[in-house]
Amino acid sequence: MTKTAKVSDIVRDWVVLDAKDKVFGRLITEIAVLLRGKHRPFYTPNVDCGDFVVVINANKVKFSGMKLEDKEYFTHSGYFGSTKSKTLQEMLEKTPEKLYHLAVRGMLPKTKLGKAMIKKLKVYRDDKHPHTAQTSKKDAK
C-alpha cells in the first residue's frame, strides 16, 4: 500500500550547498529537487516535504559558453518605454540572490505550494551565513 506524507510527519533538514566552481544549471536543478522533496522516499506532490537549502558563495558559480555576456534579464513596470535589461554578469555582481530565486522559481510549481517552497531557499554571497545552528547534519556537499 502506498503511504502518503502528512505535514505533521515531515522532518525538514537544512542542507548547505557551496556554489563555488559549480555549474549554475546543475546546481539549480539540485536545489529544486531538494526544495520539492523529490529525494525522499515518501515524496507526495501535493504536500511540501522538501528541505531548507542554504547556498553559500553564490557569486563564485561557473557558467558555460558566453552566457555571462549574452544572456539578458528583462523587467517592465507596465509603463510605455520602461523595459530595462541587465546581463547575467550584472545580475551576478549586483544581486546574485535574485538570480538564484528567478532560476529556481522556474523549476518549482506555480502555485501556493511553490511559493512556500521558494521561501525555504536562502542564498548568500560569501561563505558566512546565520544558519549555522540549524545545519548540523549535512554541510557543504
UniProtKB/Swiss-Prot annotation:
GO terms for biological process: negative regulation of translation; translation. One of its GO terms (molecular function) is mRNA binding. InterPro entries: Ribosomal_uL13, Ribosomal_uL13_bac-type, Ribosomal_uL13_CS, Ribosomal_uL13_sf. GO terms for cellular component: cytosolic large ribosomal subunit. It holds the Pfam family Ribosomal_L13. Keywords: Ribonucleoprotein, Ribosomal protein. Belongs to the universal ribosomal protein uL13 family. NCBIfam families: rplM_bact. Part of the 50S ribosomal subunit. This protein is one of the early assembly proteins of the 50S ribosomal subunit, although it is not seen to bind rRNA by itself. It is important during the early stages of 50S assembly. HAMAP family: Ribosomal_uL13 (MF_01366). This is Large ribosomal subunit protein uL13. It comes from Helicobacter acinonychis (strain Sheeba).
